[in-house]
């Protein structure tokens, strides 16, 4: 069901599915949708903060590299080992990432302090709005080796940002390094904020439901969030729920006029 309210078009759905034995029920519902008033029964304004994903451990790194680049796990670890052992740079042979075999989400205080300083400079006047000034904590698995660190860049200063570092790396090394770099940096950026409001409309006893999914503040997602989300949601059977849906605001009792009634 397509509507327009306060200048915003949107669509609501009914869970009624066509079955030959329920044809009469379907016809009655369609008749109600065409002839009965469409009245807002419930509107709940919900905003939800979305945290960044934790820094990479080995298994998550392999999974993300496969989803984004179709790298096989062994190839991902070969590239990661090369980045760990070091590449030739103008200031000598330099390890680009920490040890790539780990099951810990821990980041050292020194690394976090460096990230905060670099991000504060990167965001400039927006730093207070974007940069998390205290260390974000991620819970390890009970058997994780907490003394180890997650997979992260060894340094975060300008010469180590992917756009600069790529001149010292192969194409595939750059892909993996960039993914690790932004994933790590995003952990010290504030949460994204989404409108996830719920709308229920009554039409002659039939219920139509809509759920918003609109980003209000990008937060950590500004740092390559699109690719980070793709890597994490690729195997989510409910990935469709992340498509943007914008709903206007409503008052209970508002009467809506449908623009189009369709059946699938």
Regions found by a protein language model. Name each.
Residues 1-264:
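Core catalytic DNA strand-manipulation module of type IA topoisomerases
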């Amino acid at each position: 069901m397509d509507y327009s309210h306060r200048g915003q078009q949107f669509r609501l759905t009914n869970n009624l599915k066509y079955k030959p034995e329920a044809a009469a029920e379907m016809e009655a519902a369609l008749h109600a949708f065409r002839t009965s008033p469409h009245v807002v029964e419930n509107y709940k304004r919900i905003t939800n903060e979305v945290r960044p994903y934790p820094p990479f451990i080995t298994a998550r790194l392999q999974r993300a590299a496969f989803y984004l680049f179709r790298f096989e796990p062994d190839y991902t670890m070969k590239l990661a080992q090369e980045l760990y052992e070091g590449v030739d740079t103008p200031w000598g042979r330099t390890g680009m990432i920490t040890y790539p075999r780990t099951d810990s989400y821990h980041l050292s205080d020194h690394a976090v302090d460096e990230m905060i300083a670099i991000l504060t400079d990167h965001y400039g006047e927006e730093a207070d709005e974007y940069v998390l000034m205290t260390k974000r904590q991620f819970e390890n698995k009970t058997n994780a080796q907490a003394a180890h660190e997650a997979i992260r860049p060894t340094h975060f200063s300008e010469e180590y940002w992917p756009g600069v570092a790529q001149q010292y790396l192969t194409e595939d090394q750059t892909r993996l390094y960039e993914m690790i770099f932004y994933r790590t940096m995003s952990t010290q950026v504030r949460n994204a904020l989404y409108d996830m409001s719920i709308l229920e409309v009554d039409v002659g006893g039939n219920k139509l439901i809509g759920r918003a999914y609109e980003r209000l503040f990008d937060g950590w997602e500004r740092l390559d969030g699109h690719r980070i989300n793709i890597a994490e949601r690729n195997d989510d059977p409910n990935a469709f729920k992340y498509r943007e849906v914008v709903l206007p605001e409503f008052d209970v009792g508002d009467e809506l006029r449908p623009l189009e009634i369709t059946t699938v």
